[in-house]
């Protein structure tokens, strides 16, 4: 009986809190609608810290999220970005479990920010770091997917590709690359767009996405004739490579790399990627030098990381973030 009464009182208290937040939110909205942006912004900040000090983390986060959206709708991007940072602060301090809804909310705020603002860079960095509480060492793959799609819509293909590589969305990555290649690339390099992506996915030990991005890209690109076999030697190489990775036979991998050396020389990074793929999937030992030298080595080390544990599941990242060239 006492427990039931306590639960009932708790429900009433929760309802009162929600009602109080809604009333406050209504007043703040009215202030913004009148154009009192500075006053409203300061009031949002005051309420945030008050709620946080009272351990009302959910109320604080929801109020900042709705406030950020409100400021964005009135083209007050600086105030909106500031409240967006407070949303992250509430997540960080409360140690909230990563959920798809929260990731969608963060991606929504990201999509509304000025693409060229330093606030956006800081926001995405903190959001990815917070999301590591879920899956993936370098940010939740789902958040990477949401970010990649936003950047793709903005035609920022360079950064979109980076985030797709750290997602599990091989199909989305392929569709973006088709658009990227068709709008920005040379016809003679139509094969190189997907070859780089496949090799990088494999270096991240994501066989599934590597296969999906290759199949989707070669089927949908208007300048690629249906295969296999393909007109472009590099595409045939990748097709054979994906089969070899599934088989795991070192002799097949070695002969394949030897036979396609003329085509692989089109990009000096290809053989560096293949060295790593040989270690991950075919049991090859690392090179004698513990790290690769020169500019290419810096790029590869940033892609692969150093001294990491190779015993990971397909699709789980075991490297540092990729530097894309």
UniProtKB/Swiss-Prot annotation:
GO terms for biological process: protein insertion into ER membrane; tail-anchored membrane protein insertion into ER membrane. It holds the Pfam family GET4. Its main location: cytoplasm. Residues 307-317 have a biased composition (Acidic residues). Keywords: Cytoplasm, Transport. It is found in: Cytoplasm, Cytosol. One of its GO terms (cellular component) is BAT3 complex. Residues 1-22, 306-325 are annotated as: Disordered. It comes from the Eukaryota. Belongs to the GET4 family. As part of a cytosolic protein quality control complex, the bag6/bat3 complex, maintains misfolded and hydrophobic patches-containing proteins in a soluble state and participates in their proper delivery to the endoplasmic reticulum or alternatively can promote their sorting to the proteasome where they undergo degradation. The bag6/bat3 complex is involved in the post-translational delivery of tail-anchored/type II transmembrane proteins to the endoplasmic reticulum membrane. Component of the bag6/bat3 complex. This is Golgi to ER traffic protein 4 homolog B. It comes from Xenopus laevis.
């Amino acid at each position: 009986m006492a427990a039931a009464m306590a639960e009932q009182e708790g429900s009433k208290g929760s309802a009162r809190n929600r009602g109080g937040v809604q009333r406050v939110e209504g007043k703040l909205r009215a202030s913004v609608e009148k154009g009192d942006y500075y006053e409203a912004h300061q009031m949002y900040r005051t309420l945030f810290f008050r709620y946080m000090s009272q351990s009302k983390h959910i109320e604080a986060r929801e109020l900042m999220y709705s406030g950020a959206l409100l400021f964005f709708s009135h083209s007050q991007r600086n105030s909106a970005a500031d409240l967006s940072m407070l949303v992250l602060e509430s997540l960080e301090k409360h140690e909230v479990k990563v959920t798809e809804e929260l990731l969608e909310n963060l991606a929504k705020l990201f999509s509304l920010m000025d693409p060229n603002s330093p606030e956006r860079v800081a926001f995405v960095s903190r959001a990815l770091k917070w999301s590591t509480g879920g899956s993936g060492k370098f940010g939740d793959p789902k958040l990477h997917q949401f970010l990649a799609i936003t950047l793709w819509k903005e035609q920022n293909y360079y950064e979109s590709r980076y985030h797709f590589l750290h997602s599990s969305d091989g199909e989305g990555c392929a569709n973006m690359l088709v658009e990227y290649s068709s709008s920005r690339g040379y016809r003679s390099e139509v094969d190189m767009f997907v070859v780089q992506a496949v090799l990088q996915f494999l270096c991240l030990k994501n066989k599934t996405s590597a296969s999906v991005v290759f199949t989707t890209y070669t089927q949908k690109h208007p300048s690629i004739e249906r295969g296999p076999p393909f007109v472009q030697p590099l595409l045939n190489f990748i097709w054979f490579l994906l089969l070899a990775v599934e088989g795991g036979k070192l002799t097949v991998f070695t002969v394949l790399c030897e036979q396609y050396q003329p085509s692989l020389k089109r990009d000096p990074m290809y053989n560096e990627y293949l060295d790593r793929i040989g270690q991950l999937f075919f049991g090859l030992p690392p090179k004698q030098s513990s790290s690769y030298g020169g500019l290419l080595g810096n790029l590869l080390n940033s892609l692969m990381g150093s001294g990491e544990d190779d015993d990971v599941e397909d699709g789980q990242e075991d490297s540092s973030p990729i530097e894309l060239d």
